[in-house]
């Protein structure tokens, strides 16, 4: 006997929740966290004490759970609804149907009643009095009849109770009770109870209870209970229980329980349990349990359990378990388990397990396991396992395992394993393994392994392995391996291996190997190997090898090899080799080899070789060879060879050779050869050769040769040759030749030749020739020739020739010729000729000729001729002729002629002729003629003629004539003529003539000065009898 305890009856929803939202356990303690000891249903747990009282708070839904719990009597509070009590906690002892719950209270009530009655006394609470009284005014369960339960008395005769219109037939010890219009027929020891209009037929030892309008037929030792309007038919030993409007048919020793409106048909030794509105059909030895509205069909020895609204069809020896709303169909020997809303179809000897909302279809000998919302379809001998929301389809003898949300489709003898959210499709004999969120598609006999989030597609006989987030696509016979986040696409019989984050695309018969983050694309029968972060693209029959971070693109029949960080692009039949960080691009049949950090681009049939850090670009049929750090660019049929750090650019049919650190640029049909550190630029059909550190620039059809450290710039059809350290610049059709350290600049059609250290600048159609250390500058159409250390500057159409150390400067159309160490400067249209060490300066249209060591200065339109060591200075339009060591100075329009060691000075329009060692000084427009060693000085407009060693001085407008050793001095308007050793001095308006010598003529003694005759400005002389002597004091 249990002390201070009572039993309560209540109902919960299908999920064991009460009206307050508290979830009751299937067994054990339940407690209200918000307990308040006040009357009312809220803030506590409630129940119907002893199952007796008002049934209004109880749920009459077909899926309601009937709960029996044990409660401490001291914690109970009676509430308004009759028979209902409130309590803070309880212990669940039984959960089942209404019938099982009432039977539980009926069978265990005796363990509590005595204790309750014993404790009742004065002052006990109201609830205790209710417990003692048992309050039977509104019974929910039948009263307990102690006499019948204990079996102390046995009926000894048949009891028949019927209303009008009933027919009762019972054998010994039967009890028949029927409403009006009923018919009951019972065998020995049977009990039949029916409402009006019912029909009951029972064998011996049977019990039939039915509502009105029911039909019950039972074999011996059977038990049937049915609501109104039900039909029950059971063979011996059967137990049928059904709600109103139900139909139950059972074989021997079967047990059928169904809610109202149900239909149950069972073979012998079967057990069927169904909610209302259900249909169950089972062969012998089967066990079917279904919720309301379910349909169950089972072969012999099968077990079916389903929630409400389910449909189950099973062959013999099958087991099916399904949640509500599920559909299960299985052949013999199958085992199906599914959550609510699932659909399972299985062949013989199959096992299916699925969560709610799943669809499973399996052939014989298959095993399917799926989470809720999954779809699985398998042929015979297959094993499928999938998480919720998955779809699995398998051929015979296949094995599929997938996480939730996955889709798997497999041919026969395939194996698939996938994480959640994956998609796998495989033909027969394939093996697929993928992480969650992956997609795998495989042909026959293929093997696929992938990390989560991967996509794999393979033809037959393929093997694919990929890290998470990868994409692999392969035709038959391919082998693909990729790290996470990779993409691989392969034709048949290809092999691809890639690190994580790589992309590989290959035609049939190809082999691709790539580090992480690489991209490889290859046509059929190609072999690609790249380091991480590389990009490779290859045509058919190509072989590509690259270090990490490289980019390779090749057409068919190509071979590419590159170090890390390289870029290679090749057309068909090419061979490319590059060090790390290189870039190579080649058309068909090319051969490229580069060091690390290089860039090579080649047309078809080309060969490129470069050291590290080089850049090569070539058209077809080209050959490029470069040292490290070089740049080479060539059009078709070119041959380029450069040292390290060089830059070469060539047009078609060109040949370029350069030392390290050089720069070469050439048009087609060009030949460039350069030492290290040189720069060469040439248009088509050019030939450039330079030493190290040189710079050459040429137009088409030019030829440039330069020593080291030279600079050459030429227009088309030019020829330039320069020693080391030279600079040459020429327009078209020019020819320049310079020694080392020279500078040459020429216009078109020019020819320049210079020794080392020279500087030459020429306009078009000029010819310049200079010794070493010279400087020549000429306008167009000039010819300059200078010795070493000379300086020549000429206007257009000029000709300059100078010895070494000379300086020549001329205007246009001038001719200058000078010995070494001379300085010549002329205006336009002048002719200057000087010996060595001379200095000539002339205006335009002048002609200067000087011996060595001379100095000539002339204005325009002058003509100067001087012996060596002479000095000539004249105004414009003058003519000066001087002997050696002479000095001539004249105004414009003067004519000076002097012997050696003479000095002539003339004003403008003067004419001076002097013998050697003479000195002449003339006023403007004077004419002087002197013998050797004479000294002449004239006023304006005078004419002086002197013998040797004479001194003549004249005033304006005078005429003086003297023999040798004479001295003549004249005033204005005078005429003086003297002979040997004579001295004449005249004033104004004078005429003095002494010419005496009567040895044989010339006498002429004439004198005239002032008004009356001689006197004027003294002295005049003659003597020796010919008189006129008045010589001044010595």
Swiss-Prot record:
Q: Which GO terms describe its molecular function?
A: ice binding
Query: Where does it live in the cell?
Result: Cell outer membrane
InterPro entries linked to this entry? Ice_nucleatn
Primary location recorded for the protein, binned into one broad class: membrane
Stretches the record annotates as Octapeptide periodicity: 162-993
According to the UniProt record, where is the region Disordered?
Answer: 260-287, 311-342, 356-383, 407-438, 452-480, 570-597
Composition bias, kind Polar residues: at what positions? 261-286, 311-334, 357-382, 407-430, 453-480, 580-592
Q: Tell me, what's a Pfam family for it?
A: Ice_nucleation
Family the UniProt entry places it in = Belongs to the bacterial ice nucleation protein family.
What does the entry note on its domains? Contains imperfect repeats of a consensus octapeptide A-G-Y-G-S-T-X-T; further on a 16-residue and a regional 48-residue periodicity is superimposed.
Return the PANTHER family for the record. Answer: KERATIN-ASSOCIATED PROTEIN 21-1-RELATED, PTHR31294
Please explain the role this protein plays, according to its UniProt record. Ice nucleation proteins enable bacteria to nucleate crystallization in supercooled water.
Q: What is this protein called?
A: Ice nucleation protein InaU
